């Protein structure tokens, strides 16, 4: 990623070519500097055409800060509240990332958190920018089930995989683990959680 970033650092813009498989899934062709890169690689990506700030876009910047910190299972309101209550932390990380690295290097997605803090600080707190080009990460939840729920118009499955609105993000893997646990040998039940089912 560092080699790719060094190679592109003086380029005004570059394009990311995509490949589609037989299921309709899209994959970026480059291994580095793409929306499916590592945390570090994702943190470097900016859109060429910025979006001008609105109250909604400010909320989405806050969403990115909280999500990359580790609140990906929290409601939108909980994430917004967390950002509001942690503005001192966000400002400290944005202004002095080296001096405050212990505040961010152990979070869920440290590099994206650092990038989000810097963007949020300038766009929302300091207001010295009226636009943002930061990539906001949203992720599909068990995309195969999302497609099937949509095709079958199955509302219960759609809710389970976050196709229909819900205050709290749903977790299909956790629900399957809860239902499978009683049917597994007792010595394995303690270890049954969503991660057991989410193995590739």
Question: PLM features: residue spans?
Answer:
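Catalytic nucleotidyl-transfer cores of nucleotide-processing enzymes
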Residues: 2-188
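P-loop NTPase catalytic core of nucleic-acid-dependent motor ATPases
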Residues: 191-194
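Short, positively charged, Gly/Tyr-enriched micro-motifs
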Residues: 196-200
């Amino acid at each position: 990623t560092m080699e790719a970033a060094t190679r592109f650092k003086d380029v005004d813009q570059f394009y990311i070519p995509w490949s589609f498989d037989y299921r309709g899934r899209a994959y970026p062709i480059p291994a580095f500097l793409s929306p499916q890169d590592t945390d570090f690689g994702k943190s470097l990506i900016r859109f060429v055409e910025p979006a001008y700030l609105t109250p909604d876009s400010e909320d989405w910047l806050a969403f990115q800060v909280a999500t990359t910190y580790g609140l990906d299972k929290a409601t939108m309101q909980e994430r917004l509240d967390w950002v509001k209550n942690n503005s001192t932390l966000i400002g400290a990380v944005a202004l002095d990332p080296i001096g405050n690295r212990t505040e961010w290097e152990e979070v869920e997605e440290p590099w994206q958190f650092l990038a989000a803090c810097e963007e949020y600080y300038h766009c929302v707190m300091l207001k010295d920018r009226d636009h943002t080009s930061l990539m906001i990460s949203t992720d599909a939840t068990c995309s195969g089930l999302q497609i099937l729920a949509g095709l079958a118009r199955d509302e219960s499955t759609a809710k389970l995989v976050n196709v229909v609105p819900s205050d709290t993000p749903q977790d299909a893997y956790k629900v399957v683990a809860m239902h499978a646990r009683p049917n597994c040998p007792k010595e394995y039940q303690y270890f049954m959680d969503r991660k057991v089912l989410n193995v590739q």
